Design a protein with these regions (language model features):
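N-terminal metal-binding scaffold of metallo-dependent hydrolase/deaminase domains
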Residues: 1-46
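Divalent metal-coordination and catalytic microenvironments
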Residues: 9-10, 24, 29, 62, ...
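Short, Lys/Arg- and Gly-enriched loop/turn segments at beta-strand edges
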Residues: 41-43, 379-385
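Metal-associated gating/positioning segment near the N- to mid-region
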Residues: 51, 56, 60-123
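Metal-coordinating catalytic core of metallo-dependent amide/deamination hydrolases
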Residues: 106-125, 129, 137-249
Length: 402
């Protein structure tokens, strides 16, 4: 049993309230008590008989403390890069012309398939560690660059094994075999969709938490997405959907119909789409870096106005975005989407916990996981000012990250 007291917290942003001169008592991997330091009890039943007997006391020097950040949308299992493609894209080439020339997701699939497991694992490990060291304690991580049964299942297992290593964030694994149609299935898209639906049970057995489909122009139709998502839901996977990145194809309506845990992207939305998400309680995952790259911003302020739950994701992927810092994503969300700092920080904590079905994190409160970050600042406004606020210390489940 380990009891740790974090004290002299100048500003504690819990997710529920903001406290000054605060303290947190941690018992093993959970928060036992949180509040203003003058209110710290002398004893906590089942935790410590006398507060002077705690194992570790850490003075945080008046700093800002928040819950560990949560990245609700990433694609970290890949090899190679597409730097040259991005340079061409920014020069005016269309996505269609790049794909026709052998670029796009398909090029990453080719490289990833040709990469040995050891090299692939090391690349994913480095990315995941980058998230944790920048203050992100939970990462949603998608497969989707092998697009074979064995390759996709190996990616699920890889993520699960890496999560067990020291100094790694918690990982929510999403099965995204329905990313694009692989070349060996060109002209047989329906056959591939049916195969992916059949693989969902194997993905769940391998440790996947969610199933996702890229439902958009050039990817999968709503009917195809329905088949895969329903197949995943039937074996216990949370359904989520890439929606409205290139066009409106009914993905939002499908998300409402199936009770999806989130609709992600949402660069192209109508007032009707927003009303549907609000009415049926479909959360939105938005990614400012990718939205800026694509030149289409989701109507985040309008969604907030209508009561849609917002979560933030980096959308880390080999084609558009290499970000592993959610503090940078928060700053970009404030600047690009017009979110308040408080709304953006909630979207990067409680919002992420909501869409990942993880009520044990995202808020600093008794009984929650002790995923805690001390920042190099004394106020949350520093997130918007710094564009990449650095943590001083990170605790994952009450254990300091080295």
């Amino acid at each position: 049993m380990t009891v740790r007291l974090l004290t002299n917290i100048g500003r504690l942003w819990t997710g529920n309230e903001v406290l000054s001169n605060a303290a947190i008592l941690v018992h093993n991997d959970r928060i036992a008590w949180v509040g203003r330091a003058p209110d710290l009890p002398q004893s906590v039943p089942g935790v410590v008989d006398d507060i002077v007997d705690v194992d570790h006391v850490e003075n945080l020097g008046g700093a800002l403390v928040t819950p560990g950040l949560i990245d609700a949308h990433t694609h970290p299992v890949y090899a190679g890069n597409r730097y040259a493609e991005l340079a061409i894209r920014t020069g005016g080439s269309s996505a269609a012309s790049i794909t026709a020339a052998g670029g796009g997701v398909g090029s990453t699939v080719t490289v990833t398939r040709g990469t040995d497991p050891w090299t692939l694992c090391n690349g994913v490990r480095e990315r995941l560690r980058g998230w944790l060291l920048s203050g992100t304690t939970t990462v949603e991580a998608k497969t989707g660059y092998h697009l074979t049964r064995d390759g996709e299942l190996a990616d699920v297992r890889l993520l699960r094994e890496l999560e067990k290593e020291p100094m790694m964030p918690r990982v929510h694994v999403t099965f995204l075999a329905a990313h694009v149609v692989p070349p060996e299935y060109f002209g047989r898209q329906r056959e591939y969709v049916e195969a992916v639906g059949a693989w969902c049970a194997d993905a769940a057995a391998a440790g996947a938490d969610s199933v996702d489909v890229y439902c958009d122009e050039g990817h999968f139709t709503t009917e195809e997405a329905r088949w895969v998502l329903a197949s995943g839901r039937n074996v216990g996977l949370l359904p989520r959907i890439h929606a409205g990145l290139f066009s409106r194809r009914g993905a939002v309506q499908l998300a409402a119909e199936l009770g999806c845990a989130s609709a992600d992207g949402l660069h192209h939305m109508s007032d009707e789409d927003i009303a549907i998400m609000s009415r049926y309680g479909v959360p939105a995952v938005v990614s400012p870096a990718t939205a800026l790259q694509r030149g289409h911003l989701p109507p985040v302020r309008q969604m907030i106005k209508h009561g849609v739950q917002i979560a933030l994701g980096s959308d880390h992927n080999p084609g558009f975005c290499g970000i592993t810092s959610m503090s940078l994503v928060i700053a970009m969300a404030v600047a690009a989407f017009g979110m308040s700092v408080n709304d953006a920080l909630r979207a990067a904590t409680l919002g992420g916990a909501t869409v990942l079905g993880a009520p044990d994190r995202g808020v600093l409160a008794p009984g929650r996981l002790a995923d805690i970050v001390q920042w190099d600042a004394d106020h949350e406004g520093a997130f918007a000012w710094s564009f990449g606020l650095k943590p001083r210390r990170v605790w994952r489940g009450g254990t300091p990250v080295q």
